[in-house]
Design a protein with these regions (language model features):
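Secondary-structure transition/capping residues
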Residues: 20, 35-39, 104
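Secondary-structure boundary motif
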Residues: 15-18, 33, 69
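Active-site micro-motifs of SAM-dependent methyltransferase domains
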Residues: 11, 30, 85-88
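Enriched for short, Lys/Arg-rich terminal
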Residues: 55-61, 65-107
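Residue-level detector of beta-strand structural context in well-folded domains
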Residues: 1, 49-51, 62
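Arg/Lys-rich, positively charged N-terminal/basic patches that mediate binding to nucleic acids
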Residues: 1-27, 107
């Protein structure tokens, strides 16, 4: 399964230290292998799943949208939206999704 990294995800990983980058990479591989593993969100974040993992005594979250179940095999792409600690995570994610929708990009 292919991974598509959105700007907030890419920027966070770019600024992270190498051990955290490796931990994030491991979690991305887990999610790509089993996209249904994360917790499904409802309401404003409907369709988004969040995978939690611990690193260095902190809990990190990865927000992603798995492909549709009826998607053709060549379109099995997981969109990774954001990664970070819990503080303001959901507020920032909602803001990004709202701005993405207003600019006309496909979520």
């Amino acid at each position: 399964m292919l991974a598509n990294f959105k700007r907030p995800f890419f920027q966070y990983v770019k600024k992270a230290h190498k051990p955290l980058k490796l931990a994030i990479e491991d979690e991305v591989e887990v999610v790509c292998a089993r996209p249904e593993i994360g917790e499904l969100k409802v309401g404003d974040l409907a369709g988004i799943r969040v995978q939690k993992f611990r690193f260095n005594r902190h809990e990190y979250l990865i927000a992603y949208r798995p492909p549709a179940k009826d998607a053709p095999l060549e379109f099995l792409i997981i969109d990774f939206y954001q990664v970070g600690v819990h503080e303001n995570f959901y507020d920032a994610l909602k803001k990004y999704l709202r701005n993405e929708k207003q600019t006309g990009e496909t979520p």
